[in-house]
Amino acid sequence: MQLKYLRTLLEGQEQIQRIAGLAWSPNQQRLAIATADRHILLYDDAGERRDKFSTKPANPANGKNSYVIRGLAFSPDSTKLAVGQSDSIVYVYKLGESWNDKKVICNKFPQASAVTALIWLTSGSIIAGLEDGKVRALHSKSNKSQSLYGGDSICISLAANTKGTGFLSGHNDGTIIRYFMTDEATEPLGRVVQHPVPPFALAWPQGGFCAGGCDQRIVFYDSMGRQLRTFDHSRTEGEREFTVAACSPNGQAVAFGSFDRIRIFAWSPRQGAWSESATKEVACLYTLSSLLWRRDGARLALGSVSGAVLLFESVLRRTVWQDKFELIFVAPSQLLVRSLTEPSQALTIESQLGLEIDDVRIMGRDNYLVARTEESLILCDLTRNLSSEVPWTASGHHERFYFENPTVCLIFNVGELSLVEYGENSILGSVRTEFVNPHVISVRLNERGNAKENKKLAFLLDAKTICVVDLISRMTSGQISHETKIDWLELSETAHKLLFRDKKLRLILVDNYTGKKQTLLSNISFVQWVPQSDVVVAQSNSNLAIWYNIDLPEHVTMQSVRGEAIEVLRENGRTVVRSQDGPSEHNYQLDEGLVEFGTAVNDSDFGRAVHFLESLGDKPAAKAMWHNLALIALEDGNLRVAQRCYAALGNVSKAYYLAGMIQQADEFEESSGSPGILCPEVRAKLALLGSDLRTAERIYLEQGDIESALKMYQQLGMWDEAVALAERRGYNRIAELKQQHMDYLLSSEQQEKAGQVLEEQGDLQQAMSLYMKANKPARAARLALKTPHILQDEQVMLQVTEGLVRSELYELAGDIAHRLSRPEAALALYRKGGAYARALEIGRVVAPQEVTALEEEWGDWLVSRKQLDASINHYIEAGATQKALEAAVGAKQWRKAVQIAKVLDEPELIQRYAVDLAKHLAFAGDLDGAEDMLVRANLHKDAIELLNRHGKWERAYLIGEKHLKAEQVRELFVQLAGTLEEQGKFRDAEKVLIAVNEPDLAIAMYKRRELYDSMIRLVERYHKDLLDSTHLHLARQLESRGKLKNAEMHFVASGDWKSAVHMYCSSGRWEDGYRVAKLKGTEGASQQVAYMWAKSMPTEGAVRLLSKLGLLDTAVGFACDSGQFEFAMELCKFAGKPTDEVHLKIAMSLEDEGKFEAAEAEFLKANKPREAILMYQHAGDWQAALNVAENHLPDAVGEVLIGQASAALETSNYKDYEALLLRAHRPDLIIEHYKQESLYEDALRIAEEHYPSALNDLRRLQAQLQRGQAQAQAGEDAASISRSYLQKAAEFAKKEQFRKAAECLMQIDSSNAEDASTLERALLRAAEICNQFLEGQDAQELAQSLGPRLLAIKQIGPAAQLYLAADMPKQAVDVFIKTEQWSKARRLAKEIDPDLQLLAYVEQQQKASLKHEGNIEQLADIDIVSALDLLAEHGEWQRCLEKAKGLNPALLQKYVAVYAAQLIREGNCTTALGLYLSYGAPPIEAHFNIYTRIALDCLALREEQTERGTTWRQLRDFLFRLLQSLKATPAQSQTKFAASMEQFLLIAHYYATRAACKEVQALQPVALRLSLALLRHTDLLPVDKGFYEAGMDLRQAGREAEAFVMLNHYLDVCEAIEEGSGQLVDHSDLASTDFPSSVPLPEDIHLKNDPSLHEEVREWVLAVSMDQQVDQQLPTDDRGLYESSLGPNDLPCMLSGFPVRGRQPVTFQGSSNQVNRDVWSKFSVALKMSPGSGIADIISFTEKWQGAANYVMH
């Protein structure tokens, strides 16, 4: 959070003028300030003062100064202002909506005591805290108030929550109480916490609350009152009590105010914790009295006790979106959006979930905003200020947003379409679809003002199917299938109708209620619903078609039109179709009346609709609208309007019928008083008019009028329903009714129906007769089959059969034949009638051999009936697989077709259908199956094209590589890449080229298109060694084009920031050059650029620049250091700086040149005379130094003279020495020197003349010297002294003054003792006195002095006893330690210290002593590890390892590793290798670096250092054992280290094999191959060694061209090593190899110890380079590669390193590695011919490593 000062609204005063309150209106337009003089100042949102008014006291008699303002709060609607006063009243002022409105008091709320705090909740209540501790709610609407609760002490603060539904009150005793004004609270009410101090600063942010006070601590609590975090500022210098707090509107920041300081605390949604984010100190602000955040969180206003009011901007960060919008983040979850192009109020966008907003984008023609958090998506309609936040999981930002619909946003992500309605915080609906074009999606949400919720979505399920979804119920309300692909659809505004257009440009209308689909018109180029109506406008060719009544689509109005219709506009009472004809536009106005008719009908305004239709007269469109209005009126029960409509239509019968209904309704209304439409007879007739007979019947029966219901059915000729109703209701005249029914049937020649009735009544014979009479053989046959006795009548059955055959009812005829036991005839009839199921049943019994033919015949029959899907199984049963496949394909049963095709083996049989089947499989997502189908059909090119269309370039390449010629494949894919490139699909083109292993072409493509980022990405992946050079090349190219910014990026990426700086400086863009130097270069570099920049400018400008950069002094220093003193002087002059430093630098420069006089002048100009003096002193020119001192620095004259005197003393010139020091008034120095030299006579002479005060000291020193000499000549009687001490000690002991006695005895020492025994006796007596008579401090003090003396005379026991008696156990133990009596020391330590700490101390001291003495054997008995460490320190490694070997393996390996590390540091890698071969190499991770170093150092050895290959074999065996150990450890078997050891083992094996091959003449070519193969591993080998050895072997073999390339590269590498630049070596000559191009360079060249050989190689290369006959490049084979290089699928030969080629390579049982058969044969022959060579070892190790070889020698 950043606080930026904006402006001061009120200046602070010299005396206390406390700001009583601040209030910001919720609409952010007004800021109210309550001043100390009881006035209210009103400011607008720009901070300009707009109004002022005074408050009034509760009792005017008390005067205007009888109160102060205690609180201020705006109403939620921003029109009212509440003012709380100390005279126990709250006034509510109505301010109005504009500045000119009159201010009046609209509410008064007198209180029982003074108001101390005031807030106005957004829920509507004013909350006032009182001096008596009560908290009251004041209701402005009802002008009533109520007490909410009372506290035990004065209410000092109030804080509302962010929702405005609850508040906290802080009381003077530290109590904090929570209260909610609504019932939705989930947190407990009442006291939540007891704060340690009065909570004057109280706020309620999200997730809890916080408080601060006079203890200078800010405490954050959770919602239950538990402390979350405390910020203690009591130790902060200058910090005082916290007086006020304010919470930001979103609750994610809190501001606390104290003395001259504001502290901002912010909530981090990600960390879930509060932290102090900003502190703002404002001098002379004094204590803050008010603090308030604006509603949008972007402004913070504060008031102080001095009367100052300041305005700050509080933002986290701000950014500008495309120079159109400014995005201001005021909190992690809130931002403001302000338009930069149009003056408008900033919109607030906030995460309702409190999540941090990460990404913000303005989209949809700058009308919509999309913001993201970790768990949600925020969508905002900027034009209507509607926002929605919906849950949204992270999806990689792959969503696509569509804003074409003004009410809903469409979001497409991974095949799912989600709809979000603006202003709603939930997803309206989600559907699965792949078609997200806005033209094929239609959404209608509550349009046309429908009272009922109506939200519908129409979209494409597939290209030919439309789905309509009810978004409220989330159910599918309709699904429309079409035979052609659909390219446009749209619902009507009420969603009752759906229009869509297909690819054949046909316009189809669908009724969503009935599902009826109807084609309206063809060749449609434009179609649109007219806004706010159900009118449709479409263009077909040059005609405009208008459907004013879409319910009657056959009634269409046609109108010619010019150009192409582009839109339909409806505004200002006109509906216009706009068309575009070239550059001109045309407008065609529709009949607004007809359009308005639809609106009137929709609004049920029938009168307006009838009036309009009557005005139309006989227009064709009127008829359709009369009809439509009639139907709507009937549905609404408006009979008169319906009658009028039918009369207008000329439908006399319906008009007459309705007239009767109207009459009946009127009569019913007159008689009953109820609406006529409720008349049962009217309702029944209305149902009958709508053909709803069941409803009419129900209405009659509800009234008990069954006769009317029967009559209705009889009139309609529905006798069956009448009879059924009579039977159901138990009608008493049912027999008569049935007879009437039969008479009616016979009279109307309905014999069949009469037969059915007789059959139901059981009169079968008569029914049979009627069926035959009516020529209904099928009815007769079915009756006969159910009636056995009729079957017995052959004559009747013959007539029935003949009738059936004539009617071609062969199946029924077959049934009769089958029942009459004529199976052959039945089979023939069934086959003729297509009843193959029945035919098969009979055929399996009668003719089993024809079953297969019947199945195939059945299949053919079904195919002829177009029932292809049903025929498939029958063809399969018949074994006609080809026909089954044709039928499955024809029926589009792709799954079955694929299964059948898999059964067919011949490609020719499935080629005809393979392409179609593959397309289906690909569409279904089974790309593998599609590929297999085409490959099986030998349609390889089709398979490649299919895979390419789906982006599977690698698989397509594999098919082409396998089945097509290589050149053909490459040409095919490169051509495809070119096509993709032309289409702008560069990433797809790249994938294709990568698939065919042509990254260089992809790089070239990006270079052509100037897509340098992608180009660099590929270079980094495939040519990492050329990355820096590519960056440099692009940078130079961009620089030449003037694209300096882009060039800078590439210069910096290549690490050549200096070139970027030079580029900018050369082009005069110094500021950019300085920026790059400062960001990427060193500090000195940026300063140097700034200096050069300044040099390029006039001096005045240079001074301003350097001052701005803070580099003026640095630039002056640069100028002086470079000798440009004039420029430095000019800088100082223009900057107003003293030039002393410049003069000083000039003087020092002149001094270095020996120009002392000129230097002196400059030193003096620099006011540095002392430096001039020092210069002359260093030069030995004492007179010049003295002159300068006398003239310019008199205080230094003495120093010069002293220096000159010192120089005279060095030459023993005592005369000048004395004269100069006396001239300097320093005789004391002369005397001190003579004293040191013991020249007291000379010293006395000088003192007498010049320093009389020193005479006494000199004479005393001289006398002491003389006495010392006399004492040396005469000695004293020591015996008398010692006896006197003994006598005095005895006297003190008698007087029991034991300490004095002991001290007296201790006065006897070796200087005054009579003999040694006297001294010993005296000290022992003193010790005895201490032990017996002294204790405490006396004993300890004497023991500290006496103990060492006893120890000195070897009295060890008494000394220890003395320390023990004085309670000094450690010193007692130290006695035995110092005398190395270790057993006594241990015994004593055990006795006196049960905790054994002293015993550990003794053992530690003994170890240290033994280590110091080097007593290893004895030390080993005590501490074997210390003994081993000592051996290691002394370099006795064999003894160390032998001792460790006998202990445990882990200890042994520790010292083996230490010894090996030492050997490696000493450069003795072979000994270290032998060490691990002797003692083993455990798979311990701590040793891995040692193993790697041994391998690298050994591989760097010259061939002459390996003892004819012994080292290679040892290294190989060591690595093999190590790998075996690693594989035995599961945790290490697959690690990176194991993989690197595999590589080292392979290299060591190659070296050992090469060494063995060089011993055998026949294997010399194999040795050469190995030298070349080893170059593949120069990322591990020293690169110069590898190329040197390969080049020399090639040269020896006579292959000079290849040798030249190798040795030339060797010289290039050596040159790079010697220069130490780290630059990559040119690898272009080795492009056809698989040698790594980016390899580490060794520190020294391989031949550093043999420079003559190195020079020989250089001379040979030089000579060959001049030879024109040598090709000087590497040859390539048929693969286009160098012979040793491995292709993508090649394996290296385990004995030669070359690719395994040829037939039947030698394989191994233990691995997948191989050996070329000819190489193995050579080794086998060499083993027999040279049994003493190392070939046997090579073959043995190879089989040991890889397993037994599968090789039989022929």
Swiss-Prot record:
Cross-referenced Pfam families: TPR_IF140-IFT172 (PF24762), TPR_IFT80_172 (PF23387), WD40 (PF00400)
Q: Which GO terms describe its biological process?
A: cilium assembly; intraciliary transport; non-motile cilium assembly
Instruction: List the InterPro entries hit by this protein, alphabetically.
Output: TPR_IF140/IFT172/WDR19, TPR_IFT80_172_dom, WD40/YVTN_repeat-like_dom_sf, WD40_repeat_dom_sf, WD40_rpt
* Protein's cellular compartments: Cell projection, Cilium
The TPR repeat units are at 623-656, 690-723, 748-781, 807-840, 852-885, 1041-1074, 1140-1166, 1167-1199, 1211-1250, 1282-1315, 1698-1733
One GO cellular component term of this record is: intraciliary transport particle B
The primary site where this protein sits is: other
Q: Keywords in UniProt for this one?
A: Cell projection, Cilium, Developmental protein, Repeat, TPR repeat, WD repeat
The residues bearing each WD repeat, given as ranges, are: 14-53, 64-103, 110-149, 151-190, 194-232, 283-322, 519-557
Record-stated family: Belongs to the IFT172 family.
Question: What is its biological role?
Answer: Required for the maintenance and formation of cilia.
What name is this protein filed under?
Intraflagellar transport protein 172 homolog
Which organism is this entry from?
Answer: Drosophila melanogaster (Fruit fly)
Q: Which gene encodes it?
A: Oseg2
